Swiss-Prot record:
It is found in: Secreted. Residues 25-114 form the Ig-like C1-type domain. This is Beta-2-microglobulin. Residues 1-20 form the signal peptide. GO terms for biological process: antigen processing and presentation of peptide antigen via MHC class I; immune response. It holds the Pfam family C1-set. Disulfide bonds join 45-100. The lineage of its organism: Eukaryota, Metazoa, Chordata, Craniata, Vertebrata. Keywords: Disulfide bond, Immunity, Immunoglobulin domain, MHC I, Secreted, Signal.
Length: 119
Protein backbone atom coordinates (compact mmCIF):
# COMPACT_ATOMS: atom_id res chain seq x y z
CA UNK A 1 0.00 0.00 0.00
CA UNK A 2 2.80 2.42 0.86
CA UNK A 3 4.36 1.75 -2.56
CA UNK A 4 1.07 2.68 -4.27
CA UNK A 5 0.88 5.95 -2.33
CA UNK A 6 4.46 6.84 -3.30
CA UNK A 7 3.79 6.07 -6.98
CA UNK A 8 0.54 8.07 -6.91
CA UNK A 9 2.34 11.05 -5.37
CA UNK A 10 5.08 10.89 -8.00
CA UNK A 11 2.48 10.81 -10.79
CA UNK A 12 0.62 13.79 -9.33
CA UNK A 13 3.82 15.77 -8.92
CA UNK A 14 4.84 15.11 -12.52
CA UNK A 15 1.41 16.13 -13.82
CA UNK A 16 1.49 19.44 -11.95
CA UNK A 17 4.36 20.58 -14.20
CA UNK A 18 2.32 20.12 -17.37
CA UNK A 19 0.77 23.20 -18.90
CA UNK A 20 -1.81 23.56 -21.64
CA UNK A 21 -0.47 24.41 -25.05
CA UNK A 22 -0.61 28.16 -25.64
CA UNK A 23 -1.70 29.67 -28.95
CA UNK A 24 -1.29 33.34 -29.86
CA UNK A 25 -4.43 35.12 -31.07
CA UNK A 26 -4.93 36.13 -34.68
CA UNK A 27 -6.21 39.73 -34.80
CA UNK A 28 -8.35 41.11 -37.64
CA UNK A 29 -9.58 44.72 -37.66
CA UNK A 30 -12.19 45.74 -40.22
CA UNK A 31 -15.32 47.82 -40.73
CA UNK A 32 -18.74 46.31 -41.36
CA UNK A 33 -19.24 48.40 -44.51
CA UNK A 34 -16.72 50.04 -46.87
CA UNK A 35 -15.40 53.21 -45.23
CA UNK A 36 -16.97 56.52 -46.25
CA UNK A 37 -15.97 59.72 -44.45
CA UNK A 38 -18.82 61.09 -42.35
CA UNK A 39 -20.97 57.96 -42.73
CA UNK A 40 -21.71 55.90 -39.57
CA UNK A 41 -20.26 52.38 -39.58
CA UNK A 42 -19.14 49.63 -37.20
CA UNK A 43 -15.52 48.90 -36.29
CA UNK A 44 -14.85 45.20 -35.63
CA UNK A 45 -11.93 43.42 -33.99
CA UNK A 46 -12.10 39.64 -34.45
CA UNK A 47 -9.65 37.77 -32.23
CA UNK A 48 -9.36 34.04 -32.90
CA UNK A 49 -7.31 30.89 -32.44
CA UNK A 50 -6.04 31.71 -28.94
CA UNK A 51 -5.49 29.56 -25.86
CA UNK A 52 -5.80 29.95 -22.90
CA UNK A 53 -9.01 31.96 -22.82
CA UNK A 54 -7.84 34.84 -20.58
CA UNK A 55 -7.49 37.86 -22.90
CA UNK A 56 -7.92 41.66 -22.91
CA UNK A 57 -9.15 43.46 -26.02
CA UNK A 58 -9.48 47.23 -26.44
CA UNK A 59 -10.63 49.26 -29.43
CA UNK A 60 -8.66 52.49 -29.79
CA UNK A 61 -9.30 55.89 -31.38
CA UNK A 62 -6.11 57.91 -31.84
CA UNK A 63 -4.38 55.66 -29.28
CA UNK A 64 -7.03 56.11 -26.57
CA UNK A 65 -9.39 53.38 -25.39
CA UNK A 66 -12.96 53.63 -26.72
CA UNK A 67 -15.32 53.16 -23.76
CA UNK A 68 -18.58 52.20 -25.50
CA UNK A 69 -17.57 48.79 -26.90
CA UNK A 70 -19.60 45.59 -27.06
CA UNK A 71 -18.43 42.02 -27.57
CA UNK A 72 -19.68 38.54 -28.32
CA UNK A 73 -19.61 35.73 -25.80
CA UNK A 74 -16.35 33.81 -25.57
CA UNK A 75 -16.65 30.81 -27.90
CA UNK A 76 -14.40 27.95 -28.90
CA UNK A 77 -13.61 26.15 -32.15
CA UNK A 78 -13.26 22.44 -32.96
CA UNK A 79 -9.59 22.59 -31.94
CA UNK A 80 -10.56 24.07 -28.52
CA UNK A 81 -9.04 27.46 -29.34
CA UNK A 82 -11.12 30.50 -28.48
CA UNK A 83 -12.53 33.44 -30.45
CA UNK A 84 -14.27 36.76 -29.73
CA UNK A 85 -15.66 39.72 -31.66
CA UNK A 86 -15.37 43.24 -30.22
CA UNK A 87 -17.25 46.05 -32.00
CA UNK A 88 -18.39 49.65 -31.71
CA UNK A 89 -20.18 52.26 -33.78
CA UNK A 90 -17.89 54.86 -35.33
CA UNK A 91 -17.90 57.50 -38.05
CA UNK A 92 -14.66 57.44 -40.05
CA UNK A 93 -12.95 60.59 -41.24
CA UNK A 94 -9.55 61.56 -42.69
CA UNK A 95 -7.82 62.46 -39.41
CA UNK A 96 -8.77 59.76 -36.87
CA UNK A 97 -6.88 56.46 -36.57
CA UNK A 98 -8.53 53.32 -35.21
CA UNK A 99 -6.92 50.15 -33.89
CA UNK A 100 -7.39 47.04 -31.77
CA UNK A 101 -5.04 46.31 -28.86
CA UNK A 102 -4.82 42.75 -27.48
CA UNK A 103 -3.09 41.51 -24.32
CA UNK A 104 -2.56 37.74 -24.01
CA UNK A 105 -0.12 35.49 -22.17
CA UNK A 106 1.52 34.61 -25.52
CA UNK A 107 2.55 38.26 -26.07
CA UNK A 108 5.37 39.85 -24.06
CA UNK A 109 3.69 43.23 -24.62
CA UNK A 110 0.20 44.08 -25.91
CA UNK A 111 -0.15 43.82 -29.69
CA UNK A 112 -1.88 46.63 -31.61
CA UNK A 113 -3.31 46.19 -35.11
CA UNK A 114 -4.44 49.32 -36.99
CA UNK A 115 -7.62 49.49 -39.04
CA UNK A 116 -6.89 49.85 -42.75
CA UNK A 117 -9.81 51.71 -44.30
CA UNK A 118 -8.91 50.32 -47.75
CA UNK A 119 -9.51 46.67 -46.83
Amino acid sequence: MACFVVVALLVLLSLSGLEAIQHAPKIQVYSRHPAENGKPNFLNCYVSGFHPSDIEVDLLKNGKKIEKVEHSDLSFSKDWSFYLLYYTEFTPNEKDEYACRVSHVTFSTPKTVKWDRNL
